C-alpha cells in the first residue's frame, strides 16, 4: 500500500499542478475577453454619444433657421416689390371671345400679401427641414462608415 501511495503522489501532484495551471489560464483568458468586450462597448457608447451630439447640433441649427425665417418672408416680398415683380398665379379664364380678335387673356392674378407670405413661409420651412434631414442622414451614414 505504501508503494502504491508513493507511485500515486507524483500523479496527484501533477494533476493538481495541471488543474491549477488550467484554472489560472482560464481566469486570464476570461479577464482578457471581458476587457475586450468592455472596450468594444465603450467604443459603441462613445460613437453613439458623438452621433447624438451631432444630431442635437443639427436640430439646434434647424430651430435657429426656423426662428430666422419669421422676418425673411416680409423681406423677400419687399425685395420683389422694389424690383417691380409680383407673385402671380394662373387662373381659369371666365370666358372666351367668339371671334378671332387676336387677343389672348393673361389668365393670371396677383397673390394677396397674406397668401404670398404664407406660401413663402411654407416653402422656406420645407427647405430648412430638407436641409436638416439631409444633414442628419449624412451624420448617420458617417456613423455607419466608422463601424
Curated annotation (Swiss-Prot):
The chain crosses the membrane at residues 8-24. Residues 25-143 are periplasmic. It holds the Pfam family Phage_lysis. Residues 1-7 are cytoplasmic. It comes from the Viruses. Keywords: Cytolysis, Host cell inner membrane, Host cell lysis by virus, Host cell membrane, Host membrane, Membrane, Signal-anchor, Transmembrane, Transmembrane helix, Viral release from host cell. InterPro entries: I-spanin, I-spanin_T7likevirus. One of its GO terms (biological process) is viral release from host cell by cytolysis. It is a single-pass type II membrane protein. The keyword Transit peptide does not apply. Its main location: host cell. It is found in: Host cell inner membrane. One of its GO terms (cellular component) is host cell plasma membrane. The keyword Hydrolase does not apply. Component of the spanin complex that disrupts the host outer membrane and participates in cell lysis during virus exit. The spanin complex conducts the final step in host lysis by disrupting the outer membrane after holin and endolysin action have permeabilized the inner membrane and degraded the host peptidoglycans. Host outer membrane disruption is possibly due to local fusion between the inner and outer membrane performed by the spanin complex. Belongs to the T7likevirus i-spanin family. Interacts (via C-terminus) with the spanin outer lipoprotein subunit (o-spanin) (via C-terminus). Part of the spanin complex which spans the entire periplasmic space. The spanin complex is composed of spanin inner membrane subunit and spanin outer membrane subunit. This is Spanin, inner membrane subunit. It comes from Enterobacteria phage T3 (Bacteriophage T3).
